């Protein structure tokens, strides 16, 4: 099967500082891949390269065999900063990226995705009336409403409290089961990566290269406390320098 995302010898630096030091990775259609690495290793720069916000010094990122030169509606980014428009209602936020169809059809699509993420009844609410977890649901729904092939997530739950973040992970898995997206998640949370992903990619210190790729074979729902997953967690933490190997 051809790769949905193909990353070939990807390199990027700023002035004299090399940040991404040569990354090769293929992501299959419908696969969920998580990337973890030490703080400051170049994870966010890698995400910008994948999304087309930055161009590499050498190598390339390709989607369906086509090099990424600019941001694309087929690859939507959900970031830690949040991007909900405070002057728009939930429904209007979800309609924002919908270009096809008359207003009634776009509103129906927005309401469908609001219901999918558990926001039925809040379509007319403004962001200031919502909790942090509900705002993240709006972001996820808006990303999925434009029907992207690829969802790129840059530490999307890092600003949430631990209980809300755990709930949002479960919500994300539930929603992704309903639609077949290719997902690439960058996170500092090793348990989150193991809980969600089909594979976990561990990056080196800057300039980032791939140290190891860990396949996660256990089906969902998962418990990270399972011995097999705990063993993977310990191995990842050892590579990140948190535990002794």
Q: Over which residues does each language-model region extend?
A:
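A short, proline-enriched helix->beta-strand linker immediately N-terminal to the Walker B motif
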Residues: 145-149
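ABC-type ATPase nucleotide-binding domains, specifically the catalytic core motifs of the NBD
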Residues: 15, 88, 92-106, 116
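The feature captures the beta-strand-to-loop junction immediately N-terminal to the Walker
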Residues: 36-38
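Conserved ABC ATPase signature
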Residues: 126-130, 134
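Conserved ABC ATPase "signature" region
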Residues: 104-122, 174
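Helix-to-loop junction immediately C-terminal to a conserved catalytic motif
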Residues: 51
């Amino acid at each position: 099967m051809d790769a949905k995302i193909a990353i070939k010898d990807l390199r990027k630096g700023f002035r004299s500082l090399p940040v991404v030091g040569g990354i090769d990775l293929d992501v299959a259609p419908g696969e969920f891949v998580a990337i973890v690495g030490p703080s400051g290793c170049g994870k966010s720069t890698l995400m910008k390269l994948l999304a087309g916000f930055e161009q590499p010094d050498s190598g390339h990122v390709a989607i369906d065999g086509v090099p990424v030169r600019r941001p694309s509606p087929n690859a939507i980014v959900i970031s830690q900063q949040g991007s909900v428009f405070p002057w728009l209602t939930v429904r209007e936020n979800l309609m924002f990226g919908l270009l096809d169809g008359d207003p009634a059809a776009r509103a129906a699509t927005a309401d469908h995705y609001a219901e999918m993420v558990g926001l039925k009844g809040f379509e007319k609410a403004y962001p200031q009336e919502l909790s942090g977890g509900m705002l993240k649901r709006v972001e996820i729904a808006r990303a999925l409403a434009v029907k992207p092939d690829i969802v790129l997530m840059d530490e999307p739950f890092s600003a949430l409290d631990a209980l809300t973040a755990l709930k949002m992970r479960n919500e994300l898995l539930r929603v992704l089961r309903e639609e077949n997206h290719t997902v690439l998640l960058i996170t500092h949370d090793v348990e989150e990566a193991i809980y969600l992903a089909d594979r976990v990619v561990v990056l080196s210190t800057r300039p980032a290269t791939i140290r190891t790729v860990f396949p996660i074979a256990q089906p969902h729902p998962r418990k990270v406390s399972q011995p097999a997953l705990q063993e993977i967690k310990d191995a990842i933490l050892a590579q990140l320098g948190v535990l002794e190997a």
